[in-house]
Amino acid sequence: MNGAVNNSKAHLLAKLCMEIEGGCAELYHCLSEIHRNDPHAARLWKKTALEEEKHRKLFELAVHLMDEVECEFVTANMERALIVHQKLHELLHIVKKNPPDLITALGKAIEMEKHIADLHVESLVHFKNEGMRRMFDALYRADQDHIGSLERYLASISPPPTGIPAM
């Protein structure tokens, strides 16, 4: 990174990403508890929560290594990250106040994961170190896996559209 200002912004962005991943984990743990009577749903929420905790730890590692490993955070995405952070915390507040049914929860989780995946696709962080780059590439792939898992489960429990016979 060039200059203390950019490095400071990069640290803020990395910490914001940590908070986003931690917030996602909290959301999914909450949904696992809300839907505990549906074992498949509870397991899916719990699995996703644990994966988000790993993502949080990955950003925490990036914060610690930022000054030691050549990396660059794209701080131009700060505003977008702040919006995702705000939307996530609004969703978490709503879920805690008014627990959603499973279909609504899945739809909102998919929407949030897509926002996060878009943020990650814009390459928030670039590493020159191959090992670090691979770890973050795995994070980006995991975003797509989360979306796919949630979408498949939603499709499996959603009723078919009216007027079209079920197959």
Where are these regions (language model features)?
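Non-heme di-metal
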Residues: M1-M167
